[in-house]
Amino acid sequence: MFTYFRGELIEASPDEAVIEVSGVGYLLSISATTYRQLPEPGREVLVLAHLHVKEDLMQLFGFLEEEERQLFRLLLSISGVGPKLALAILSGLQVHEIQEAIVSNMPERLFEITGVGKKTAARIVLELRDRILKLRPSGGTKSVSRLSESSMRDDAVNALVTLGFLRSVAQKAVTESLTSLRNPQVEDLVRDALLTIRTP
């Protein structure tokens, strides 16, 4: 539902930022890494967004770099890693340092971050090593394409869930839309998926 926000940065702290877009203020949780790269309040900024939906709670997360958003989403796929811990990891090390720790099989680097236990660090390295390697330039354009598709699928599914549809129904409809549409954007996926869901 939300891919990015372009607007005026109203205020920011090491863990939150408020961006005003067309008179509406959006509160986004951010990493310390993103905070250090933000401009001064009052300046225009473009922040990439991730909408996290869990039961009756919706929370927006903001990133200045696509690479950081991708890594955030990968971390969320690990059992035991929620958005709070994922942000702590992104705040504890630079994105390239986290990637290097994972591909070099060095869970001890992640264990140095407050809140990351030894088992969680080991699980992150074990489950993400191959996926991180595929995202690197040597992995080829197909890997980047797959990531982009996965990102759009997640955004479209989350948008449909926000509209009140069951996640299983949303996932099925979005998957069908990805198959039938050519080079779709998130908005195209949501629109086509809605037609699929509402067609008897």
Curated annotation (Swiss-Prot):
Disulfide bonds: none annotated. Its main location: cytoplasm. Keywords: Cytoplasm, DNA damage, DNA recombination, DNA repair, DNA-binding. GO terms for cellular component: cytoplasm; Holliday junction helicase complex; Holliday junction resolvase complex. Residues 1-64 are annotated as: Domain I. Residues 65-143 are annotated as: Domain II. Residues 148-200 are annotated as: Domain III. GO terms for molecular function: ATP binding; four-way junction DNA binding; four-way junction helicase activity. HAMAP family: DNA_HJ_migration_RuvA (MF_00031). This is Holliday junction branch migration complex subunit RuvA.
